Swiss-Prot record:
Subcellular compartments: Plastid, Chloroplast thylakoid membrane
Protein name, entry field: ATP synthase epsilon chain, chloroplastic
Record carries keyword Flavoprotein: no
Pfam families reported for this sequence: ATP-synt_DE, ATP-synt_DE_N
Record keywords: ATP synthesis, CF(1), Chloroplast, Hydrogen ion transport, Ion transport, Membrane, Plastid, Thylakoid, Transport
GO-annotated cellular components: chloroplast thylakoid membrane; proton-transporting ATP synthase complex
N-terminal signal peptide: none
Oligomeric form and interacting partners: F-type ATPases have 2 components, CF(1) - the catalytic core - and CF(0) - the membrane proton channel. CF(1) has five subunits: alpha(3), beta(3), gamma(1), delta(1), epsilon(1). CF(0) has three main subunits: a, b and c.
GO molecular function ontology, one term from the record: proton-transporting ATP synthase activity, rotational mechanism
Organism: Picea abies (Norway spruce)
């Protein structure tokens, strides 16, 4: 049995195919979804989603949103998302370094919150790359 997974952002379809299993980061923790999962609507946190296809895992950095699970169909509506294969490691490392520095020099509560969210997004992109298996040539 499989699940139909669709990941949508406001401007594009990021993923639309059959999968065996997903592990999703929600605001109340991670949940694993297999076929015949109970119906559910959940807030999606900034975090990594793991996707299992025929014995291989893929990852995706999700930047918050909502997920609906119903009758083996999973629809994830996100602010933005990137597949592990689309993330440039050097650029992600540089973004993380800049976000960390911005948080260290943030002045005031608003700047600190914005810098913390930027750091969480940057960390998620790095985690999506490191959580995916190496690509063999």
């Amino acid at each position: 049995m499989t699940l139909n997974l669709r990941v949508l952002s406001p401007n594009r379809v990021i993923w639309d195919s059959e999968v065996k299993e997903i592990i999703l980061s929600t605001n109340s923790g991670q949940i694993g979804v297999l076929p015949n999962h109970a119906s559910l609507v959940a807030a999606v946190d900034i975090g990594v989603m793991k996707i299992r296809l025929n014995g291989q895992w893929s990852t995706m950095a999700l930047m918050g949103g909502f997920a609906k699970i119903d009758n083996d169909r999973i629809t994830v509506l996100v602010n933005n998302a990137e597949r592990d294969v689309d993330i440039d490691l050097k650029e992600a490392q540089e973004t993380f370094k800049v976000a960390k520095a911005d948080l260290a020099r943030a002045e005031g509560k608003r700047q600190a919150i914005e810098a913390d969210v930027a750091l969480k997004r940057a960390r998620t992109r790095l985690e999506a790359i490191s959580a995916s298996p190496p690509v063999s040539n």
